[in-house]
Regions:
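Cleavable N-terminal signal peptides
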Residues: 2, 13-14
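A contiguous strand-loop segment
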Residues: 16-116, 136-290
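Short, well-ordered beta-strand elements within core beta-sheets of diverse protein domains
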Residues: 120-126
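Accessory, solvent-exposed terminal regions and/or long lumenal/extracellular loops of proteins
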Residues: 258-341, 345-347, 437-439, 448-449, ...
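Substrate-recognition/cap regions that form aromatic- and gly/pro-loop-enriched pockets
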Residues: 322-458
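Histidine-centered catalytic/metal-binding microenvironments
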Residues: 441-501
Length: 501
C-alpha cells in the first residue's frame, strides 16, 4: 500500500514536461528548449501576437490562463515584439511546468494580476535576452503580483539556457520568490512538475540569480531558521513527496538517462519514490551532442526498456493490454480493497494539448533566430511544423480560427468555433485522430508505423527549413520586409502541406 504522500501528486494546473539543452550540448550550437503542455482540457493551437507600437498610457489586459478569468491591467510598453507561441522575433524562448508547492503560497485569490501564462507572453513581448527575460519576470511579479502557484520556467536565448523556479508569496505578500540557474555548457536540464532547485550559490551572478528576499521571506513567514548557505529552495517551497518523485522526477530521470550515458542510474530509488534523500543533480552532461531529432525522441519517451516501462513487456502490467500500450487513462492513482495503486507517468502522453521543440541560433538574423517546431496533440505521434519567431501569419489549420475551448486562453481573437466541436479543418483534430489509432490493443502494430512516417516527414521539414534559412539570409541582405514575407509564406505552406498529408 502506498503512503498518503502519494495523494499530493502534481500540484497546480497543467502537468507538463520540459527538456533544456545548452548550446554546448547541441549538435549545431543552438540552444534547444522543449515543452509538452499536458492537460485534458487543452486543445492545441498556436498563438500569434504581432509586433506593435503602443500609445502612451496604453494598458495590457491580464488573464488567468487556466481559469480564463480577467485579472486586471498593467501599463503597456511603447513597443512589443512579435511572439509566435513561446518564442519571439529576437530568439528568446520560454517554457514551463507547474509544480504547485505549498498551498499557503498559491497566488490565486489575493488580488494579484499576472498568472504564469501571461507572465510568459508579456515577457516574450519585451525581452531581448534570457537574462533580461528573468529580470522582467521578477519585476512584473513584484509590481503586479504573481497569480499562480509554483512554476519551473525554461528561459533561453541563442547563448544561454536558464532554469527559473518561481513561487508566489501567496497570502503573505504581493510578489514572488525565485531562483534561476544557468545550465552549464555541455549539460542539459529537465523539469516535470516538481521543483528541482535545492541549495544554490549565492555569490555567482554569472550562473545563479535569485530574488533578493528568497531566504528572508522564508524566515519571516515560514519558520526557516537555518543559515543562508544551507537554504534549500525545494525543501522550503515544494517539499518532495512520493508523488513528486514518482510522477515528476521519474520523467526527469527518463529524459536524463539516455543522453548522459546512464549517469542517473544511481538515483533510480529516488525516481521510484523510495529514497527521497537520493536526489538527482540539477543538470547532467551529455555523452553525445544532441540534434533536434534526438530531442524529438526524448520527448516521445514512454520509459521503454526502463524499470518504469508500463508496456507489460518486461513485467506484468494489465493496463498495457494485448498491444502492450504505455498509455493510461486518468487517474494516476486509484484505490482497491484498501490499497492505493498507480500508473506510471511518461513524457509522451495522450493528453497533451500541444508540444514544441524550439531552437535559438545566434548566427541567424533576428526573425529566423528562433524556430518553434510546433505540434498539436501527443508529442509521440505528431509531426512538428516549423514556425519562426518573426512570422506574421499562422497556417490556417493551426490557429485559433479552427477552434479553442469556449472561453479558453487569452481572448485576443475569439474563435468562431469551440475546441469541443470536432473539426476536420483543425490540425489538432487530425493529429488527435491519428494518435488515437496507436492506443490500447493497436499500439504494438500501429505505433511503429506512425512514428516511422512522422520521422520521415520531420526529417524532410528539417531539411526544408535549412534551405529556406539560406535563402532568407540572402534576401534579408537586400530587402528585409520581403525576407519576412518569404519566411512567413514558407511557414504557412509547410504547415498546410503537412496538414493535408
Amino acid at each position: 500500500m502506498l503512503g498518503l504522500a502519494l495523494l499530493a501528486v502534481v500540484g497546480g494546473a497543467r502537468a507538463c514536461s520540459n527538456f533544456l539543452v545548452s548550446k554546448g550540448a547541441s549538435a549545431d550550437g543552438s540552444t534547444i528548449l522543449s515543452y509538452t503542455a499536458d492537460d485534458l482540457s487543452l486543445f492545441g493551437s498556436l498563438d500569434l501576437r504581432l509586433a506593435a507600437d503602443h500609445a502612451p498610457g496604453s494598458l495590457r489586459n491580464m488573464w488567468d490562463w487556466d481559469d480564463q478569468l480577467f485579472t486586471g491591467t498593467i501599463p503597456e510598453v511603447p513597443h512589443t515584439l512579435n511572439v509566435v507561441g513561446n518564442v519571439n522575433e529576437v530568439g528568446v524562448i520560454i517554457t514551463e511546468t507547474t509544480f504547485g508547492g505549498r498551498s499557503d503560497l498559491d497566488g490565486h485569490g489575493h488580488g494579484n494580476n499576472i498568472s504564469y501564462g501571461d507572465l510568459i507572453w508579456t515577457t516574450l513581448s519585451r525581452a531581448h535576452t534570457a537574462r533580461e527575460a528573468i529580470q522582467i519576470m521578477d519585476s512584473l511579479t513584484q509590481l503586479y503580483g504573481y497569480e499562480s502557484s509554483g512554476e519551473s520556467y525554461g528561459v533561453g536565448d541563442s547563448d544561454e539556457v536558464w532554469l527559473l523556479e518561481m513561487m508566489s508569496k501567496g497570502k503573505y505578500a504581493r510578489g514572488s520568490v525565485w531562483v534561476a540557474s544557468r545550465i552549464p555548457e555541455g549539460y542539459v536540464g529537465a523539469t516535470a512538475n516538481q521543483a528541482r532547485t535545492t541549495t544554490f550559490a549565492q555569490n555567482d551572478p554569472d550562473n545563479v540569480l535569485f530574488a533578493k528576499d528568497v531566504v528572508q521571506f522564508a524566515r519571516d513567514n515560514l519558520g526557516y531558521t537555518g543559515t543562508d548557505a544551507d537554504f534549500n529552495f525545494r525543501e522550503m517551497y515544494d517539499p518532495i513527496t512520493f508523488g513528486g518523485a514518482r510522477f515528476g522526477e521519474q520523467r526527469v530521470w527518463t529524459m536524463f538517462n539516455p543522453v548522459c550515458g546512464g549517469c542517473v542510474d544511481a538515483h533510480l530509488d529516488f525516481a521510484q519514490g523510495y529514497n527521497l534523500n537520493n536526489s538527482m543533480p540539477l543538470f547532467v552532461p551529455v555523452v553525445k551532442k544532441l540534434s533536434v531529432m534526438d530531442v524529438v525522441h526524448v520527448m516521445r519517451d514512454h520509459a521503454e526498456g526502463t524499470w518504469f516501462d508500463p508496456s507489460g513487456l518486461d513485467r506484468p502490467d494489465v493496463g498495457g493490454e494485448s498491444g502492450h500500450s504505455p498509455y493510461r487513462v486518468r487517474p494516476l492513482t486509484w484505490d482497491f480493497n484498501g490499497s492505493t495503486y498507480l500508473n506510471e507517468r511518461t513524457v509522451g502522453i495522450q493528453q497533451s494539448g500541444w508540444a514544441f521543440i524550439a531552437q535559438s541560433r545566434g548566427w541567424l538574423p533576428p526573425p529566423i533566430r528562433a524556430v518553434n517546431w510546433f505540434a498539436p496533440d501527443d508529442a509521440s505521434t505528431s509531426p512538428r511544423i516549423p514556425m519562426y519567431g518573426g512570422a506574421t501569419r499562422i497556417p490556417a489549420a493551426f490557429g485559433h480560427t479552427v477552434g479553442q475551448v469556449p472561453g479558453g486562453g487569452v481572448p485576443y481573437a475569439p474563435s468562431p468555433v469551440d475546441g469541443f466541436t470536432m473539426n476536420l479543418q483543425s490540425a489538432f483534430w487530425i493529429w488527435n485522430l491519428v494518435g488515437n489509432v496507436a492506443f490500447s490493443e493497436r499500439y504494438s502494430t500501429a505505433y511503429p508505423d506512425i512514428v516511422a512516417q512522422v520521422d520521415v516527414e520531420q526529417t524532410r521539414m528539417l531539411a526544408d527549413s535549412l534551405q529556406m534559412e539560406k535563402d532568407f539570409v540572402a534576401l534579408w541582405a537586400v530587402d528585409e520586409a520581403a525576407a519576412v514575407e518569404f519566411m512567413t509564406k514558407f511557414c504557412e505552406d509547410e504547415g498546410m502541406d503537412m496538414f493535408k498529408k
